[in-house]
Each structure stands twice: as structure tokens, then as C-alpha cells.
A protein has these predicted regions:
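General small-molecule cofactor/ligand-binding pocket signal
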Residues: 51-53, 223-226, 258
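A short coil-to-beta-strand element that immediately follows conserved catalytic motifs
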Residues: 121, 217-229, 292-296
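C-terminal lid/capping helical subdomain adjacent to the catalytic/cofactor pocket in oxidative enzymes
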Residues: 228-231, 238-318
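Mid-domain catalytic core of redox enzymes
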Residues: 30, 54-215, 243, 250, ...
């Protein structure tokens, strides 16, 4: 509905006060992709004296007297116990509650957390010679490819959900953006299902076959590929989610524990709002602006729709 409305408004030059994030035409994007943001963040953190521990998988969270005392992590060299004053968690709520030890969460809270649902995700990156989609717009692009950054797939006879065109996100992510196109194919699935269990070769053949079926690429045009599985990519709002407020109340009762991010709050927020939850958490810890623990959980909850935002004045100028 929003897509159709957007098309009509553009056709009749109607300005909208609000615009969906997925329909915004201008945005900031790191030169080498979102990973560059976190690489720079990590570098700045270490420059400020922070110690970043990689490949540490949290196995146990030790709680006593309403406070987290330490976490036990499995590493390549064995288990390691890490103590701290404040703990900020972005791990899935389901796993967080299950890992709490010593002073366990109440049985009801454990049951709610265990029942929280998720949708898992697979993406396949394909480097292709060209796309058969034509650029029929007045927007100039390298190689004159279609100007879209992402395309939602509506065909009922394919399983693909969305196509990313990385040349248009940032041409610096593609070695030869004038003669090749790097695309990302997105699929929604469940961990352990047939699609999830495909080998990389099987999945790439399947995904590229769907592109050929839709006429987007020609058979044999794939020059390179990469596939990634992402567990718990999409927190879902059914099953025990109706009682999520009880889990939030319990987590807020753990004095030095803060939950942030999409999985940390079991909320289908975009990247911007997910980062904002961390900002609110730090503001509360630092005692800035009167931010409460409840405010950390309220980021983006007062919107009409989770990806709706007020259109900035600069963006409305023709």
C-alpha cells in the first residue's frame, strides 16, 4: 500500500509529511558498506583504551542479589570468566534469559523467553556480468544499470524476498562497477529447514536459477558468489511475545544489565533505532538528560509504523 501511495504522490507531485524508511531516496552510507562503521567504531574504542574481545561466546551470566557479577565465555583457548560493573547486552533475549545462572530468572520469565519466535535469514552475494533490467529513468548510474538500491520480489513462484544492488549503495564495494554488478539475494527461512541446510553450491545454484527464471540475469553470467546464514535475524511478534512486558520488567530489575539492539530487545527495529537504544542506555548510565531504564525500551515505540519518520525539511526541497 505504501509503495502504491508513494507512486501516486510522485506522479501528481504531492509532498508527504512522512515517508517510509524503505522508500527514502537519499541517505548516508559508508563508502565500504556498513561493516566499515563498526570497524571504525572498534578502532576508536581501542584508541580510547578499550579492550575488544573477539570470538568470545557467552555461555553463562552469573547473577546475584539482582546484579550481574560476571559472564563465562567459551573461547578457542577454553572458558574465561569476565567480571564487570555494567553489562550491555545485544544478544537474543531468548539466549540471555537461558544463560542466566546463580540467581535464575523466575520460571514464568524463562518460559516466556524460551517461546519467543524468530525468522532466520540467508543472503547470497553474486557477481554478474550484467542485469537484464533496463534503466528507464533519468537517473545516471555507472554502467547505466537500474538505479535501485533494493528491489522487493513479488513473484509468487519464487522464494526470493529482496534483491540488493551493491553498485548503487556504493560503487567502491565493487572492483569493476562499470562492467560488473554485485547483487545480494535475500531469503527468509528457519534454522534447520531444507533451505538452511543446502550447501553453498546448492544454494547459489538455486538462487541464481530464480534470477534466470525471472529474466533478471542470463544463465552462466555468475562470475563469483558468497553465501551467509544469519540466525535470529528477525524477531517475531507472536507466540509468547504477548507477554514480553513481563520479561522487560524482569530485565529492568537486574540493576547493572542493559538490553539494546534488535535482538537485545526482541524488536524489529531498523539499524538506526537499534543504535539509538544503545545511546539511550549510555545516557542512563552516565546520568544524562533524565533518561530512565524504561526510556531505553521506548525507542521507536511511539511511531505510527516501525519505519515511519518525519520527513526532514531539506529532503522536501525540489
Amino acid at each position: 500500500t505504501a509503495v502504491i501511495s508513494d507512486m501516486f504522490k510522485k506522479a501528481f507531485h504531492i509532498k508527504s509529511k512522512k515517508v517510509e524508511t524503505s522508500l527514502i531516496e537519499q541517505f548516508y552510507y559508508p563508502k565500504f558498506g556498513p561493516g566499515q562503521l563498526w570497524e571504525q567504531t572498534a578502532a576508536d574504542f581501542e584508541k580510547m583504551g578499550g579492550h575488544l574481545l573477539m570470538r568470545h561466546n557467552v555461555e553463562k551470566i552469573n547473577v546475584r542479589d539482582g546484579r550481574v557479577l560476571s559472564v563465562v565465555c567459551s573461547t578457542e583457548s577454553g572458558d574465561k570468566t569476565i567480571e564487570g560493573d555494567i553489562f550491555i547486552s545485544s544478544m537474543p533475549v531468548k539466549d540471555l534469559i537461558a544463560d542466566i545462572s546463580g540467581e535464575e530468572a523466575p520460571q514464568k520469565i524463562r518460559e516466556i523467553a524460551a517461546g519467543l519466535p524468530y525468522r532466520d535469514f540467508i543472503t547470497a552475494g553474486l557477481l554478474v556480468d550484467r542485469l537484464n533490467l533496463k534503466n528507464t529513468t533519468n537517473i545516471k548510474t555507472l554502467g547505466n544499470i537500474v538505479p535501485d538500491c533494493w528491489i522487493y520480489v513479488q513473484e509468487p513462484d519464487v522464494k526470493m524476498g529482496r534483491i540488493q544492488i551493491f553498485n548503487n549503495w556504493s560503487p567502491y564495494m565493487v572492483e569493476d562497477p562499470e562492467h560488473t554488478v554485485w547483487i545480494g539475494l535475500e531469503y527468509f527461512c528457519n534454522e534447520g529447514d531444507d533451505m538452511w541446510n543446502m550447501s553453498d553450491e546448492e544454494f547459489v545454484n538455486f538462487a541464481s536459477g530464480e534470477l534466470v527464471k525471472m529474466g533478471i540475469i542470463d544463465s552462466g553470467s555468475v562470475k563469483a558468489s558468497h553465501r551467509e546464514r544469519v540466525k535470529k535475524a528477525y524477531p517475531a511478534y507472536f507466540d509468547t511475545y504477548a507477554e514480553m512486558d513481563k520479561v522487560v520488567d524482569y530485565l529492568n530489575s537486574v540493576d547493572n544489565l542493559y538490553c539494546v539492539g534488535r535482538n537485545g530487545q526482541h524488536r524489529y527495529n531498523n539499524m538506526d533505532h537499534s543504535m539509538a537504544t544503545a545511546f539511550r542506555a549510555v545516557e542512563h548510565i552516565m546520568g544524562v538528560g533524565g533518561v530512565t531504564r524504561e526510556d531505553i525500551w521506548k525507542v521507536n515505540t511511539d511511531k505510527e509504523y516501525h519505519e515511519m519518520q518525519a520527513e526532514q525539511n531539506a529532503a522536501t526541497a525540489d
